[in-house]
């Protein structure tokens, strides 16, 4: 669900968020900063957003499970990716948190090779993390790549012609083409070593082997692990999931809620400066439930103030919490199902998408519903924090809120405007002034709209959206559902009963595994995360030029998609207004890519 510099050198642009964080301070408050001796031990309890719960443990995520609860709040706690992006108050490659040294990149004969040396990490069973563990993950990925959330045809792993083990700590990947070194990290950052010496099995009772070295064997191993992954009730007891190289091990899990408890991995080889010994991650059904718990029990160490309750921050700080916004590097959107038989032909008309975008009052929503804790989305590259990846054109809003412009667009293309009802196509056809290809006479602008419940700000956005659309004669039938349900539904679907508009209310973060904001998994016609089946040959062509085209190619790509509207752009909410126990240290500054670092947290007396 997340993101992706350009230069021939291996220097990665790390964007400081100083201006961003300074801007957030004006909207934040905090309790007096507690100081005192460090406490050894203790438990930190984290509150997740409503409906976001841990329900996928295998580090080969499917798109519908690519959520914060399954990545930053579980997978990354237990298994570390090869390269880590983000850090306290910054984006970009984090060499300290990465489990491999920067890649040595060479080009020969039109092909790029990355040679990688692993740092001396160990699994929790004492065995070293080796090149074979990386190869194991890679082989399993190839065995079931179509289900992997990061898959785009022709990109990783299709573009790897050779994986060579040089030594237990060194390996190389040769790619079929020439890549910019920094873009290459988009590919390399997706690699996650997993314990071949413990997981390379075809059944629970079978021996560990080297089955993954053949395609047929890799499929069997993947099938076995996928079956184990589906058994949520055994997440905390299955010996497979106890072999980790991350800083935390799962000790307790409630399958019905996704609540999880972790303890420190004593064998963790990476940086860890904190002192807490355990971590609890809790799911909530609504903002109200979380906020009531935060105020009443004091049992939450790291929670949030709902946007709708932003004015109540004083109550939280008086209870000893420090409060600060958590801006994130991402984009937010409403997805359109271009393949829906009833309405796909309508969504394929650019003027319809332009009219809809003109009816979305992003500035108004940020002010009224997010209370200033958000930023607009104008295209496929985040506006905040400012970075060299953002073109000067995409800093401007190509479709500002303008209901009259929306009505004019629809009327000019053959629609009878019915304010408060549903506009009707009265001029079918394919000329510039007709409704467009595939739209019949009498067809109406009436759509089902699925959205995630539980977050009051999202509910208010959707209600305002429905009202604005209605005034222009676009009828929305709202269908609220839990966050996990809405995310799971946002996949390709071509039946008449399928979803039409889908809004899960949270942003697409350019993390994990990305160094610059290449959205190919979302916008390429073969991208596995292209749930709406958007298909634009020009977009595909521009995306194909990103690996070797540098920043000019990235700018051309984003400027095109900003105006083409493969999705409807919505405000990017801050991750949350964080509320942290005043005695819990090491949390701030927060990571714009949504990662957490509880191994560095500690309490003071």
Positions of predicted regions on the chain:
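Aromatic- and charge-enriched surface segment that lines or borders ligand/interaction sites
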Residues: 101-149, 161, 166, 171-174, ...
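Ligand-site clamp/hinge motif
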Residues: 117-118, 122, 236-239, 259-314, ...
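Extracytoplasmic/peripheral linker and loop segments enriched in polar/acidic and small residues
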Residues: 37, 354, 366, 408, ...
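N-terminal lobe/hinge region of extracytoplasmic solute-binding protein
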Residues: 45-109, 139, 243
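Tryptophan-rich aromatic "cage" segments
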Residues: 60-62, 580-605
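Append "and occasionally in soluble cytosolic enzymes with long acidic Gly/Pro-rich linkers
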Residues: 261-263, 348-467, 556
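A bilobed periplasmic-binding-protein/Venus flytrap-type ligand-binding module shared by bacterial periplasmic
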Residues: 263-267, 328-352, 368, 394, ...
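Surface-exposed binding/hinge segments that line
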Residues: 153-226
């Amino acid at each position: 669900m997340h993101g992706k510099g350009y230069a021939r050198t291996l220097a990665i642009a790390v964007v400081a968020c100083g201006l961003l964080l300074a801007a957030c301070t004006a909207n934040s408050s905090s309790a007096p900063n507690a100081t005192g001796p460090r406490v050894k031990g203790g438990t930190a309890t984290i509150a997740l957003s409503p409906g976001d719960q841990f329900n996928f443990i295998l580090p080969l995520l499917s798109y519908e499970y690519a959520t914060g609860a399954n990545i930053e709040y579980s997978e990354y706690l237990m298994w570390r990716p090869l390269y880590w992006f983000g850090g306290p108050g910054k984006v970009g490659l984090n060499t300290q948190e990465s489990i491999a040294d920067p890649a040595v990149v060479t080009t020969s004969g039109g092909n790029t090779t990355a040679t990688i040396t692993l740092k001396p990490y160990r699994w929790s069973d004492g065995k070293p993390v080796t090149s074979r563990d990386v190869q194991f993950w890679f082989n399993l990925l190839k065995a079931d790549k179509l289900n992997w959330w990061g898959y785009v045809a022709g990109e990783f792993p299709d573009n790897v012609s050779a994986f060579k083990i040089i030594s237990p700590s060194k390996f190389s990947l040769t790619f079929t083409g020439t890549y910019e070194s920094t873009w290459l990290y988009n590919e390399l950052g997706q690699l996650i070593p997993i314990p071949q010496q413990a997981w390379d099995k075809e059944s629970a009772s079978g021996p560990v082997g080297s089955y993954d070295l053949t395609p047929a064997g890799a499929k069997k191993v993947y099938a076995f692990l996928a079956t184990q992954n589906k058994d949520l009730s055994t997440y905390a007891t299955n010996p497979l999931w106890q072999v980790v190289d991350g800083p935390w091990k799962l000790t307790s899990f409630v399958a019905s809620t996704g609540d999880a408890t972790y303890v420190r991995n004593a064998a963790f080889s990476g940086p860890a400066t904190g002192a807490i010994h355990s971590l609890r991650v809790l799911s909530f059904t609504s903002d109200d439930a979380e906020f009531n718990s935060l105020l009443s029990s004091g049992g939450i160490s790291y929670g949030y103030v709902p946007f709708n309750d932003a004015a109540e921050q004083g109550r939280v700080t008086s209870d000893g919490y420090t409060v600060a916004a958590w801006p994130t590097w991402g984009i937010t959107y409403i997805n359109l199902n271009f393949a829906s038989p009833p309405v796909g032909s309508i969504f394929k008309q650019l003027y319809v998408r332009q009219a809809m975008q003109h009816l979305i009052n992003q500035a108004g929503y940020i002010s009224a519903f997010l209370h200033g804790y958000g930023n607009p989305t104008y295209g496929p590259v985040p506006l905040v924090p400012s970075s060299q990846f953002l073109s000067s054109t995409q800093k401007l809003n190509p479709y500002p809120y303008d209901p009259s412009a929306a009505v004019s667009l629809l009327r000019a293309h053959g629609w009878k405007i019915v304010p408060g009802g549903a506009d009707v196509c009265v001029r079918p056809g394919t000329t510039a002034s007709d409704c467009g290809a595939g739209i019949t006479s009498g067809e109406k602008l009436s759509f089902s709209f699925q959205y995630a419940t539980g977050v009051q700000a999202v509910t208010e956005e959707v209600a305002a959206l429905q009202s604005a659309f209605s005034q222009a004669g676009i009828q929305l039938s709202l269908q609220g559902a839990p966050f996990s349900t809405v995310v799971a539904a946002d996949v390709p679907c071509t039946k008449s009963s399928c979803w039409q508009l889908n809004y899960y209310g949270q942003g697409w973060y350019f993390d994990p595994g990305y160094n610059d904001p290449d959205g190919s998994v979302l916008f390429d016609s073969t991208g596995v995360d292209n749930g709406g089946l958007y298909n634009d040959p020009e977009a595909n062509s521009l995306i194909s030029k990103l690996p070797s085209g540098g920043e000019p190619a990235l700018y051309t790509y984003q400027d095109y998609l900003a105006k083409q509207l493969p999705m409807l752009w919505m405000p990017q909410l801050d991750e949350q207004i964080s509320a942290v126990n005043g005695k819990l240290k090491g949390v701030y500054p927060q990571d714009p890519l949504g990662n957490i670092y509880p191994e560095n947290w500690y309490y003071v007396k």
